[in-house]
């Protein structure tokens, strides 16, 4: 793994965070391949979480990008009461580890923290995520996002824009 690749992947993930914080949903969704998987599993116990979304519960599971597109549609049209009003968010990505997979895809493992404020309630979600990225001519596309939420309590709504 080269320093140039690490830098490019890090910048891509920082841009993803910025797009989400700025509610730039079209550009945000465009970062995902059409058939990209998005998964936030639930915990089974203190040290094990659901590995297969078809065999256990998940906080969020989208088999492909259409799940994110549907969620954004509901937010934009006011049909998502849990997201009205949207929270202000600040996504932080750190401890980025990058490696090239045998099939030419890129794996990026990160730690993340999202601070949010909605209707006077401030909070923080944090965890780890693994991305599988497909290199493009000038950037990357997300093939898979697997985020593990480390919070024990969810005192508010948990949605894709919190992760």
Curated annotation (Swiss-Prot):
Function: Component of anthranilate dioxygenase multicomponent enzyme system which catalyzes the incorporation of both atoms of molecular oxygen into anthranilate to form catechol.
InterPro entries reported in the protein's UniProt record: Anthranilate_1-2-diOase_ssu, NTF2-like_dom_sf, Rng_hydr_dOase-bsu
Classification lineage: Bacteria, Pseudomonadati, Pseudomonadota, Gammaproteobacteria, Moraxellales
Coiled-coil residues: none
Protein name, UniProt field: Anthranilate 1,2-dioxygenase small subunit
Enzyme class: oxidoreductase
CDD domains: ring_hydroxylating_dioxygenases_beta (cd00667)
Pathway: Aromatic compound metabolism; anthranilate degradation via hydroxylation; catechol from anthranilate: step 1/1
Stored PANTHER family: BLR3401 PROTEIN
GO biological process terms held by the UniProt record: 3-phenylpropionate catabolic process
Keyword line: Aromatic hydrocarbons catabolism, Dioxygenase, NAD, Oxidoreductase
Originating species: Acinetobacter baylyi (strain ATCC 33305 / BD413 / ADP1)
Catalytic activity line of the entry: anthranilate + NADH + O2 + 3 H(+) = catechol + NH4(+) + CO2 + NAD(+); anthranilate + NADPH + O2 + 3 H(+) = catechol + NH4(+) + CO2 + NADP(+)
Activity at various pH: Optimum pH is 6.3 for the reverse reaction.
Gene field: antB
GO molecular function annotations of the record: anthranilate 1,2-dioxygenase (deaminating, decarboxylating) activity
Pfam families with a match to the protein in the record: Ring_hydroxyl_B (PF00866)
Subunit and interaction comment: The anthranilate dioxygenase (AntDO) multicomponent enzyme system is composed of an oxygenase component and a NADH:acceptor reductase component (AntC). The oxygenase component is a heterohexamer of 3 large (AntA) and 3 small (AntB) subunits.
Entry's EC annotation: 1.14.12.1
Entry similarity comment: Belongs to the bacterial ring-hydroxylating dioxygenase beta subunit family.
